[in-house]
UniProtKB/Swiss-Prot annotation:
The active site is at E174, H248, C365 (nucleophile). GO terms for biological process: arginine catabolic process to glutamate; arginine catabolic process to succinate. The keyword Glycosyltransferase does not apply. It is an enzyme of class 3 (hydrolase). This is N-succinylarginine dihydrolase. One of its GO terms (molecular function) is N-succinylarginine dihydrolase activity. The lineage of its organism: Bacteria, Pseudomonadati, Pseudomonadota, Gammaproteobacteria, Enterobacterales. It comes from Salmonella heidelberg (strain SL476). It catalyses: N(2)-succinyl-L-arginine + 2 H2O + 2 H(+) = N(2)-succinyl-L-ornithine + 2 NH4(+) + CO2. Its EC number is 3.5.3.23.
Length: 447
């Protein structure tokens, strides 16, 4: 059956700021306390979406979350009105305020893991929400992510959205950022590659930075998504690269159809994995980048592998890259050599995503890939699909509500909370989502 990959990109939230919340993510740590520009950030993301949609790649949007997230502060023992809570936490525990104001839901590669209908035992599209329990600020996301996905993928005859795994370390799940699908045509059955950093009785794990994904979680997600057991491979990421800042597999590898583009040091038993894929995926091609041409540290600094690999109508592939790759002489030299060689990657497109990149999120972090047949695509909430009208409306919405300068101190401003809630209220109507946010359900829009 004919199917296409649709990229659902996360809209950057109104509280996008640099707090260094993500240990193991070196860009996040390096840019801590810098001044951010939320309006520029959301517009950089919108420009990427629109350019790819105009080039013929189906594109949709996933909204940001409510931030600052007052219910989490109430759970932590802060009391009073919303404004009083903001004041108290800013004075007593500013780190908590930064955590509950994180715009990290924009990196929707961590929102869920997706199984196309061609791979599922019941013939439905499955999405399992990620629990993201390695970081407090990300562990807050799952309930609203689930509500948003249910509002986008409403038709239960076509889609199954599963709640996140239990919030325990044993079942740490980071979503599609640790998942690749390889195969031929999108509508044909593929091989799903789940990548983990640790498993309970395996002592091979990183020493410096945490391994966020467990094998136990990957196996549970594969079961929930009803992936045909004959079409699954579980592989461990190289713990040494995790310790060099590769906190998700999509920082060191990206796949599309029959191609796996990765660093030669990406996986723990890479030769074995490559041979497995070669026997199970027709026409499989591994493009392994040698350390002699691009070091792991340069790959992390430029996010070479946090790129999008997209199929064009003629069968060739486009590599969508952050500007940092172009700015690095060695990486850019390698890339120009790559597209000149005999492989499906024949073109590159560079985007300026510096606001997201400074927090450790490149092009691939910002998107959730969902393979859909024409019938399934028609069943998606049409209001989230990118087109000229939506692009214009979202830019006007951003101009109205987003600030062009934000510091950690600004997070305590009760006006920012009100602006955010009003903006999301408008956005849910624009995208026909219903009342997906807690403030809409409790009638707390006025604080």
């Amino acid at each position: 059956m004919t199917a296409h990959e649709v990229n659902f990109d996360g809209l950057v939230g109104l509280t996008h700021h640099y707090a260094g919340l993500s240990f193991g993510n070196e860009a996040s740590t390096r840019h801590r306390f810098q001044v951010s520009n939320p309006r520029l950030a959301v517009k950089q993301g919108l420009l990427k979406m629109k350019a790819l949609a105009d080039a013929g790649f189906p594109q949709a949007v996933i909204p940001p979350h409510e931030r600052p997230f007052i219910p989490a502060l109430r759970q932590l023992g802060f009391t009073g009105s919303d404004e009083q809570i903001l004041d108290k936490v800013a004075r007593q525990a500013p780190r908590w305020l930064s955590s509950v104001s994180s715009a990290s839901p924009m990196w929707v590669a961590n929102a869920a893991t997706v199984c196309p209908s061609a791979d599922a035992l019941d013939g439905k599209v499955h999405l399992t929400v990620a629990n993201l329990n390695n970081k407090f600020h990300r562990a807050l996301e799952a309930p609203v992510t689930e509500a948003l996905l249910r509002a986008i993928f409403r038709d239960e005859s076509q889609f199954s959205v599963h709640s996140a795994l239990p919030q325990v370390a044993l079942l740490g799940d980071e979503g599609a950022a640790n998942h690749n699908r390889l195969g031929g045509e999108y509508g044909s059955a593929g091989v799903q590659l789940f990548v983990y950093g640790r498993e309970e009785e395996n002592e091979i794990r990183p020493a410096r930075y945490p391994a966020r994904q467990s094998r136990e979680a990957s196996e549970a997600v594969a079961r929930l998504n009803q992936v045909n057991p004959q079409q699954v491979i579980f592989a461990q990421q190289n713990p040494e690269v995790i310790d060099q800042g590769v906190f998700h597999n999509d920082v060191i590898a990206v796949s599309n159809r029959q191609v796996l583009f990765c660093h030669e040091a990406a996986f723990a038993r890479q030769k074995v994995l490559i041979n497995q894929l070669r026997t199970r995926v027709d026409g499989f091609m591994a493009i392994e980048v040698p350390a002699g041409e691009v070091s792991v540290s340069d790959a992390v600094a430029t996010y070479l592998f946090n790129s999008q690999l997209l199929s064009r109508n003629d069968g060739s592939m486009l590599l969508v890259l952050p500007r940092e790759c172009q700015d690095h002489a060695g990486v850019w030299r390698y890339l120009n050599k790559l597209v000149a060689e005999d492989n499906p990657i024949s073109a590159m497109q560079v985007f300026d995503l510096r606001e997201s990149m400074a927090n450790g999120g490149g092009p691939a972090c910002l998107r959730l890939r969902v393979v859909l047949t024409e019938e399934e695509r028609r069943a998606v909430n049409p209001a989230v699909m990118m087109n000229d009208a939506l692009f214009t409306a979202l830019n006007a919405w951003a101009d109205r509500y987003y600030r062009d300068r934000l510091t950690a101190a600004d997070l305590a401003d009760p006006l920012l909370l009100r602006e955010g809630r009003e903006a999301l209220d408008v956005l849910t109507r624009l995208l026909d989502l219903g009342s997906v946010y807690p403030f809409q359900q409790t009638g707390a829009a006025d604080g």
